[in-house]
Every structure is written in structure tokens, then in C-alpha cells.
């Protein structure tokens, strides 16, 4: 990090100017505009050269030291900025605001923008499929206020959360690229371990000033209308976010129009482990392939894709909203109405982010061209929605509206294919502004004007040797030979005498000169002014346009879900008041798409008589798939989607927990078993009788008896909590749980052996599995034949020699648990092995006694 320079007297004037600006932004890289380059100096240069793989050099001296520096062309800055932002860096853009031709000393410069990962809005720097969120948090270990802002859409929300565990789960859900925390928090707190965490001064979170700035932003007297007047901590966090956004953008933020109060009680909560295990929008390898999002997303717009991602990561418990979405999807499916709408939606584009850039006053010409095309497409879109009779769809159609005046304005203003930036002009159409047309005509047609003027003057004066010309010193002129100079008309004003010639100027030529010499720069300046005026006109319509964008995004998602329902054979789930979860012919929506063979659908039935299924069966038999598909079906139902099942009847759930798969946490110093136990503890502490719990192979990673005991106790606890539980295990001993826990039922995934090879049937059947087929799976995996053979020998010996071990005691008042052989017990003791080989009939009494003494010493 750079250190502040207090004594600037020894530095050159240029470096004094640089350090005055840099001292205010020591922890950020500074791009310092000098001519056609952004120059980067000192420690910033060393860091940028390494990150961007550009040459580090040194040029000149200041304060007796050479200046490390590197630079990038200003017209290529976008690519470099994108790379830095992806690396989590923030960049201060310092531009020349003075005129080099008139400046005495260094040209005036000022910071015009600060680009940070959470406040970028440039299309080239953003992932169009993901929200780009920045969050701020305030509070203590008991209660936290969290504010979340997407500056690229204007979405601004607050909520209050109890405890670190819930806060971290919510941060995992929203996954902000920046997280602002108070500077007076002690170091090392869990939130600070997230990438992108930044400390801000405590007064940025001060409640009263935050309340005042938020009211000013939304032009309200208080925040009661947003339902968050009493959320002291959340308001403080929101004020910090607003301050940070203004600081980085250096402009007003008219697209931030409201504050939404979110409540965790309105949602189905998924913790970090559950999101990871269910692979909602990111697979276990960190990619996007073979995720629920990849299967369910055929949205026509990027803003629709982002909204669908939000829905998948925030399933709802509001039955009114869910049923409105179901009705909308049903309406779209009638007569395949979605097919009429989707091509129209494709013409809309990502107007949500375009409108945000307009609000930030950094929209580019191509943004306005896309907005023009979108507004022009709205009438046809409205026509396509005219026969939609679902109330929610009618409301969305009404909100979308049309904007013929704005469409006409942009149609008149912006050329068909504008350049990427306004910098060099050429954006506005001929005919949009008469003065601009005149200036551009002067600039582009100066040569023709001079030819025409020369012809007119020759005709007027009768002087055939008259010439019209130009030089840089004297400008435009009319030249006559000295012999004809006396015949010059009275309106000719002598400008220059040459050997053998005289040069004149006329009022008409002088007027043209004044216009022509500055026409190009004046045309560019006027075009930029007109462009900024156009942006201001659009900002005046920002509120209804943003409402339109939100309505179109939701229409896109709902029509997409209708298309998915048709093409993936999804059916509408039915929510009921009775506590239950009944699925007929359920399928895993992702696995089904990647299989080359038909997917084997399975049923599930949980209700007041059965709250837990103990699932046994071979590895690769489909236990994990069966559990995951249940969770995904329940989750899809809670976003209002149709589900991959012949039928589904369920009550609302409050949480979805998963304890599936194995992974360690090396950075946190936690083993695989420790991670597993932490996830199990979280489930046991937070599950309720409305939660869906998936537990897969609990107890692995420790000794057989420890693991079995933990799994047994965890299963008993969940059964007593009455959570909807799928409990997959290889501990066959757990199949006796139904005898002591009446809400528990056994099911198994079946398989068979054919020609000594295992065949997985993937069918869920009642009762426990008959065997585990572990050796057959190992053989299928390619374990060497000699190892398989030796394993069979050990298995046979274990099955014939292992003694029953003591089972966990039954609870008081419950029947005793039948004893079973432990197929996982350790190998027999060598003494027992030797005893089994003794031929007793061939020994004398003395030999037998001696052998007993010998064996006794080995015990």
C-alpha cells in the first residue's frame, strides 16, 4: 500500500498534483490521465504491472527519486479495468478537466469515478447472468442489520438477522462482491474472512445521518412507507451503502428509488452446505454446467436469467405469490401462449441495466440504441399479452406499458448503428438538431463551399484569375494578381500583400471562416451536450421505465417456466394445509437431462404417520440422487414452478437442510469428519417439524462404533423433531429404528447380480436392503482382481467369525433392539485364528494344557 506524502514541496508540480489526489485514495489504484494514456505511478505501478502483465519502467525524477510507472492507452482501458475488477481491485479514474492549450502549469485534473467490484456498471465489466451485489452489515453477535444494493439495477433491500450463523448463511446466498463492515469491529470476525470485505469509518453507519440521507434519496419524510423505520441496524448499514455508492459514482443516483424490507420468515432458508450440495447455480467444480439453473433457464433476456437465479436462491413461503405464479404458468401453457411472447421478449434485451447506466449518466450510444429497439418492440409485446387472462399476468402487462413518445425521440435521435462511445461523435442522426447539422456540414463540406464561393466570385467580379484559398497563419482568403487588385469590389477587405498578388477577405468569407475553423470541435461539443440532454430527458422517465423492466423480467421468467414445464414434462404441485410431502414418479431434473438411458422415477410419501425414511442400498444405487431430487422438487415448488413429478402434494416447508457428500476445510483447519459433524450440528439445532432434512452417510470418518452411535442418535433426534427426513446409511443396524421410532420407515434402492456383476435397478422399494454389494461396486470401479479376491476371503471370514456386538440401548418403555452381526467389525484375533486350526483329537492332555498356557500369554 502507498504511504501518504505530507511534504510535497520537493516534488515537481505534476507530482504535487498527483499526490494531492492520491493521498485521498491510498488503498486504491489510480489511473492518472495524461494525454492519450492513463499513467500509473509508484507502488500502484509495481502492483498494476504485475497484475496486468505490462511493462514497469521509470521515467524522470521527483523529490530526488526516479518515478516507477507504467501506462495503458485510454481507449483500451476497459479490458484492463475488467481484469483488475475480477481480481478484486478498486481503481480511481482521474481525468484531465482543463484545456492543455490554455493551462499554465499542470492541466487541472480531478477524480471523476471510482471503480470497485461492487459498484461497476459498464457492460464489459459485468457478468450479464449474475447480480453484482454490494452489502453492508452492522451489529453484534446477537442481531445484525444487513443492507444489499445492486447498483446495476437499483434494487436496494434491508433485513435484520439474528446470530452469526444466519448472517453467514444469508451472505452465502447473496454472495456480494464487496462487503462493508465498521472499522471499529475487532479483527478476525467471520464476516471479514469473506473476499471483498472492506472496513468503513464507524460514522458511515450512524443511524440518524443514514436515515436523513435515505429520506433525501427517496424524497420522503421518513422510511415508514418502506416498512423499515424501526430497523435501526439495517438503516445504518443502508446509509453506509448509499454513501459508498455516491462516493464511487460521483453523481446523483436517481435509479435508486426505494428500499425493500425483506424477512427471512417469508423464505425457505437454505444454508451454505445445502446450496453447495444441491448445485443450484454453481456445480461442485465451480462451473455452471449441470446445475438446476442450467436446466431451468431458457429465458430470453439477461434480466430474466438474473431474476430466475434470485428465485432459485430465495424460495418463498408466501402461498399467495406461489399460487399466482402457478396460475400464470398454466395460462402460458394454454394453447402454447408462451410461444407468442418469447420471440417478442428477445427483442427487449437487458433494459434493466441500461436504465441503471442512464441513471448513472454513463449510458453509451449503443445502450440508447438497444433501449430504442426495446421501446419500439413494446407495442407488439402488448399485443402478444392481450389474451392472457391470468390476473397476475394482466397486472404485469399493465405495468409494462408502452412509450411511443420516448421510442420516437430515440428513433429520431440515435443512428441505426452508433459507435461504442460518444467521444468522437457520429451518434446523432442528421435532422435531429439544425445547429448540429450546420456545424457538421461546415466541417464536412468546407472544400465544396470554397469551390462554390470561387465560382460565384468569378462570376460576380468578372475576374477570371481570382482564387479562394487557405493557410494556417492567415486563414481563408481571396487572392487576386497585383494587376487586378485595383478592380476588387468595395466589399473586399485587404488581408495580405504578396509579391505579385493581393489577398482579401469578404464578410461572407469571414463568417464562414469563423464557423469552419471551429466547426468540428463545436460540432462535437454540441453533440455531447445534446446527448447529455437526451440522457436527462430519459432520467425524467426512469421510474416507469424501471417498473416496466421489472415486469418484463418476471414475464420472461414465467414464460420460461411454462416452456420448461412443457419440454421437461413438469407438473403443477399442490400446496395443502395438512403436513405432508407426497411425490409420485419424482425425477431429478438435472440427472435426467444428462442420462443416455431413461430415468427411473420414484415415489415418496411423508406425512403425520411417517416423517423419516431410512434409506439403504448399494453405493451407486441412487440413494443420493433420490434425496437430492426430493429437495429440488420441493425447492422448485417453492418458487412457483412446476416440478419433475407425475404429481406432488406438499405443505410449506421452512428450511431445506442437506448433509451430503464429503469435503474438508483445510483453510479452516477442519477435517472431513469435523465438517460433517458441524453440518450435522447445524441441522440438529435448527430443524423443525416443517423442515426437509437430507442426511447421507452420517458417521463416516471415525471408528465403526463411534460412527454408528452418532448416526443412530442423530436419526433418533430428527425423528423426535418430526422433521421430514431422508436418512441414507450403510449402517444396516439403523434399519431397526422403526421398532423404537414409529414415525420411521425403511426403504431401499434395489440391485441384483447377474454373472457376478451388479446391475443397479434404481427403484425405491419398501423395507431394508438385503446386502450392500460393496465388493461388486469396487469391482465395477476397477479395483484389481486380486484385491477383490482377497476381500472376498476377508468378508467370508468376517461373516462366519465376527461376534455380535452390543447394540445401542433402547429408550425406556421401548422394545429392546434385536442384535445383529456387525459386518464392519475388526478382523478376528490371531488367537482365535490359531484355535480354529487346532486338531484337538490329535493332542494329548499335556499338549492341550501347554497350548492353553501359550495362548493365554498372547491375549
UniProtKB/Swiss-Prot annotation:
Residues 799-821 are annotated as: Disordered. One of its GO terms (cellular component) is cytosol. ATP binds at residues 617-624. GO terms for molecular function: ATP binding; ATP-dependent DNA damage sensor activity; damaged DNA binding; mismatched DNA binding. One of its GO terms (biological process) is mismatch repair. Transmembrane segments: none annotated. SUPFAM superfamilies: DNA repair protein MutS, domain I, DNA repair protein MutS, domain II, DNA repair protein MutS, domain III, P-loop containing nucleoside triphosphate hydrolases. Keywords: ATP-binding, DNA damage, DNA repair, DNA-binding, Nucleotide-binding. InterPro entries: DNA_mismatch_repair_MutS, DNA_mismatch_repair_MutS-lik_N, DNA_mismatch_repair_MutS/MSH, DNA_mismatch_repair_MutS_C, DNA_mismatch_repair_MutS_clamp, DNA_mismatch_repair_MutS_core, DNA_mismatch_repair_MutS_N, DNA_mismatch_repair_MutS_sf. SMART domains: MUTSac (SM00534), MUTSd (SM00533). Belongs to the DNA mismatch repair MutS family. This protein is involved in the repair of mismatches in DNA. It is possible that it carries out the mismatch recognition step. This protein has a weak ATPase activity. HAMAP family: MutS (MF_00096). This is DNA mismatch repair protein MutS. It comes from Pseudomonas syringae pv. syringae (strain B728a). The lineage of its organism: Bacteria, Pseudomonadati, Pseudomonadota, Gammaproteobacteria, Pseudomonadales.
Amino acid at each position: 500500500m502507498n504511504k501518504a506524502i505530507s511534504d510535497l514541496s520537493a516534488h515537481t508540480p505534476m507530482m504535487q498534483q498527483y499526490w494531492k489526489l492520491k493521498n485521498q485514495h491510498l488503498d486504491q489504484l489510480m489511473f492518472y490521465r495524461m494525454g492519450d494514456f492513463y499513467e500509473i505511478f509508484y507502488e500502484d505501478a509495481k502492483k498494476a504491472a504485475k497484475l496486468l502483465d505490462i511493462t514497469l519502467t521509470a521515467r524522470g525524477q521527483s523529490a530526488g527519486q526516479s518515478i516507477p510507472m507504467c501506462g495503458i492507452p485510454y481507449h483500451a482501458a476497459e479490458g484492463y479495468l475488467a481484469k483488475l475488477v475480477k481480481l478484486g481491485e478498486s481503481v480511481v479514474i482521474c481525468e484531465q478537466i482543463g484545456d492543455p492549450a490554455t493551462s499554465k502549469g499542470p492541466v487541472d485534473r480531478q477524480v471523476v469515478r471510482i471503480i470497485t467490484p461492487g459498484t461497476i456498471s459498464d457492460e464489459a465489466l459485468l457478468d450479464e447472468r449474475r447480480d453484482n451485489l454490494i452489502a453492508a452489515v452492522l451489529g453484534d453477535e446477537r442481531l445484525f442489520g444487513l443492507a444489499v444494493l445492486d447498483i446495476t439495477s437499483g434494487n436496494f433491500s434491508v433485513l435484520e438477522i439474528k446470530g452469526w450463523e444466519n448472517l453467514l448463511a444469508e451472505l452465502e446466498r447473496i454472495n456480494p462482491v464487496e462487503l462493508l463492515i465498521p472499522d471499529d469491529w475487532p479483527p478476525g470476525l467471520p464476516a471479514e474472512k469473506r473476499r471483498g470485505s472492506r472496513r468503513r469509518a464507524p460514522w458511515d453507519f450512524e443511524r440518524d445521518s443514514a436515515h436523513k440521507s435515505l429520506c433525501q434519496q427517496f424524497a420522503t419524510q421518513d422510511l415508514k412507507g418502506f416498512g423499515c423505520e424501526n430497523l435501526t441496524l439495517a438503516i445504518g448499514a443502508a446509509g453506509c451503502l448509499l454513501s459508498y455508492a455516491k462516493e464511487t459514482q460521483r453523481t446523483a443516483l436517481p435509479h435508486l428509488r426505494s428500499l425493500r424490507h425483506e424477512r427471512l420468515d417469508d423464505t425457505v432458508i437454505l444454508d451454505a452446505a445445502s446450496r453447495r450440495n444441491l448445485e443450484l447455480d454453481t456445480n461442485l467444480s465451480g462451473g455452471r454446467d449441470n446445475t438446476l439453473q442450467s436446466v431451468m433457464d431458457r429465458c430470453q433476456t439477461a434480466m430474466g436469467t438474473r431474476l430466475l437465479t434470485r428465485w432459485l436462491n430465495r424460495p418463498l413461503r408466501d402461498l399467495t405469490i406461489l399460487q399466482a405464479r402457478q396460475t400464470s404458468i398454466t395460462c402460458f401453457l394454454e394453447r402454447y401462449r408462451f410461444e407468442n411472447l418469447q420471440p417478442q421478449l428477445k427483442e427487449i434485451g437487458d433494459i434493466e441495466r441500461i436504465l441503471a447506466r442512464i441513471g448513472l449518466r454513463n449510458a453509451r450510444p449503443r445502450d440508447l440504441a438497444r433501449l430504442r429497439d426495446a421501446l419500439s418492440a413494446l407495442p407488439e409485446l402488448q399485443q402478444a399479452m392481450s389474451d392472457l387472462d391470468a390476473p397476475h399476468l394482466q397486472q404485469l402487462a399493465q405495468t409494462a406499458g408502452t412509450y411511443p413518445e420516448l421510442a420516437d425521440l430515440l428513433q429520431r435521435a440515435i443512428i441505426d448503428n452508433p459507435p461504442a462511445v460518444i467521444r468522437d461523435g457520429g451518434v446523432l442522426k442528421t435532422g435531429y438538431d439544425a445547429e448540429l447539422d450546420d456545424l457538421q456540414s461546415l466541417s464536412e463540406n468546407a472544400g465544396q463551399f470554397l469551390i462554390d464561393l470561387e465560382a460565384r466570385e468569378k462570376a460576380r467580379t468578372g475576374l477570371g484569375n481570382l482564387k479562394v484559398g487557405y493557410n494556417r497563419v492567415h486563414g481563408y482568403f481571396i487572392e487576386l494578381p497585383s494587376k487586378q487588385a485595383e478592380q476588387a469590389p468595395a466589399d473586399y477587405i485587404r488581408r495580405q500583400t504578396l509579391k505579385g498578388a493581393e489577398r482579401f477577405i469578404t464578410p461572407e468569407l469571414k463568417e464562414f471562416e469563423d464557423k469552419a475553423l471551429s466547426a468540428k470541435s463545436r460540432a462535437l461539443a454540441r453533440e455531447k451536450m445534446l446527448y447529455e440532454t437526451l440522457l436527462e430527458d430519459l432520467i425524467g422517465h426512469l421510474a416507469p421505465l424501471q417498473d416496466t423492466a421489472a415486469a418484463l423480467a418476471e414475464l420472461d421468467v414465467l414464460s420460461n417456466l411454462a416452456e420448461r414445464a412443457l419440454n421437461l414434462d413438469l407438473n403443477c404441485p399442490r400446496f395443502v394445509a395438512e403436513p405432508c410431502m407426497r411425490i409420485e414418479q419424482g425425477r431429478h431434473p438435472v440427472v435426467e437431462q444428462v442420462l443416455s438411458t431413461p430415468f427411473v422415477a420414484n415415489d415418496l410419501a411423508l406425512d403425520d404417520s411417517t416423517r423419516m425414511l431410512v434409506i439403504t442400498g448399494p453405493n451407486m444405487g441412487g440413494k443420493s440422487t433420490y434425496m437430492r431430487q426430493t429437495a429440488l422438487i420441493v425447492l422448485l415448488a417453492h418458487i412457483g414452478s412446476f416440478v419433475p413429478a407425475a404429481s406432488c402434494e406438499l405443505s410449506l416447508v421452512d428450511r431445506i437442510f442437506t448433509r451430503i457428500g464429503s469435503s474438508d476445510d483445510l483453510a479452516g483447519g477442519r477435517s472431513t469428519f469435523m465438517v460433517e459433524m458441524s453440518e450435522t450440528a447445524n441441522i440438529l439445532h435448527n430443524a423443525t417439524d416443517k423442515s426437509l432434512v437430507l442426511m447421507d452417510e452420517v458417521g463416516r470418518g471415525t471408528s465403526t462404533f463411534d460412527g454408528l452411535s452418532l448416526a443412530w442418535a442423530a436419526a433418533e433426534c430428527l425423528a423426535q423433531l418430526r422433521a421430514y427426513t431422508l436418512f441414507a446409511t450403510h449402517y444396516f443396524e439403523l434399519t431397526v429404528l422403526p421398532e423404537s421410532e414409529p414415525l420411521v420407515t425403511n426403504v431401499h434402492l434395489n440391485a441384483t447380480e447377474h454373472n457376478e456383476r451388479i446391475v443397479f435397478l434404481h427403484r425405491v422399494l419398501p423395507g431394508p436392503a438385503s446386502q450392500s454389494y460393496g465388493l461388486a461396486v469396487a469391482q465395477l470401479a476397477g479395483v484389481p482382481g486380486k484385491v477383490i479376491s482377497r476381500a472376498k476371503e476377508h468378508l467370508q471370514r468376517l461373516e462366519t467369525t465376527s461376534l455380535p456386538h452390543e447394540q445401542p440401548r433402547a429408550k425406556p418403555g421401548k422394545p429392546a433392539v434385536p442384535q445383529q452381526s456387525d459386518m464392519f467389525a475388526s478382523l478376528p484375533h490371531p488367537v482365535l485364528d490359531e484355535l480354529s486350526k487346532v486338531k484337538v483329537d490329535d493332542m494329548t492332555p499335556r499338549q492341550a494344557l501347554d497350548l492353553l498356557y501359550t495362548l493365554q500369554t498372547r491375549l
